[in-house]
Amino acid sequence: SSLRQVSPNTTTAQAVVGAGAHLIEVYGQLAAAQMLIPAGSCPTVGITGLALGGGIGVLGRAYGMTSDNIDSLQMVTADGVLRTCSPNQHEDLYWASRGGGGGNFGIVTSFTFKTHPIPAINLFTLEWAWGDAGAVLESWMQWLPNTPKELWSNCQLDSNGSAGGGGVVKVTGVFAGPTAACSSALAPLLSAAGSTPSYQFVGPEDYFRAMTIEGGCEGESVSQCDAVTRSAFVAKSSYINAALSGAGVSSIIDAISSLATTVPSVGGGIVFDGYGGVINDVAADATAFVHRAAVACAQYSVTYGSGNPPDSIAAGVTAWLNETQTRFAPYATGSYQNYIDPTLPNWAEAYYGSNLPRLSQIKRKWDSDDYFHFAQSIPLSA
């Protein structure tokens, strides 16, 4: 349908994307035209929810949030009128739609995105013994803000599920540039971490194949990737604006050990997604996406496999997530609006921060009857 259509325009370096398109469809169609937009990893995620709430991805430090690449959008507002929102038409809706979250101001039917030429792509994976996890996390958080914007990385701490409380620590990422420059950018991390990785890979990859690797459907076609099924999981998130060290790092490592003892039969962990680069070059009030000073966004999650877990396990999982949120509390500066969290206290402030009053003002102007309403929609007054 036209709602899933992706139409690249190499002359204007733009792409018109229907609101129903999935990320893997966008990546596939644009790659065929040697173009990209920065967006998320999960192949079956819809472009609209992702873009309206920000959109972090593996090329975000190089090209910005997905929302930063919206040149204009078409939206049906609560009065039933289809409107074009851009820097010079309905500028308030355009501002609110770049980070203000989905389902708040109207029904988006299409986006026009700014696109970028596909660069050389390199992938990297580094793994260390669990005993090095604290040193690796601390080194990673201090290293990342000083890396080139072409580099994106995450740091993953995963429970191995054993009552002994061990786990897996790895740093993975994508570099939009030559292999030699990627290796050079990684050198300070390897030096700072202090110990040699147990596994190390750095190498070039085709752009579209790299997107399938990051999306968990390596080497598959668009239609195959679009059929990927996901395990059931529950998660929370915290933005971190300053590198953790000492007690903060120890507390996070302890959280992984705690998961294995609290609910030993489930998988889970904490992943720190890197921010910075051009994401943080944008002022916090330039768009509705306020999180412009973060070193990383931490997502802590537990995977169930499929279906709902027994109550006994669910209780343990909830307890661990809440305990981990408490561990992050001294360092947290909000939560990611696209990782919507039904149990988050003060969610509106956590998602939107200092932009909340303006978002509420725009909500009152365009949807005074609160027609577009859900449990965590933008409130009419803030």
Language-model segments: which ranges?
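Soluble FAD-dependent oxygen oxidases
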Residues: 1-382
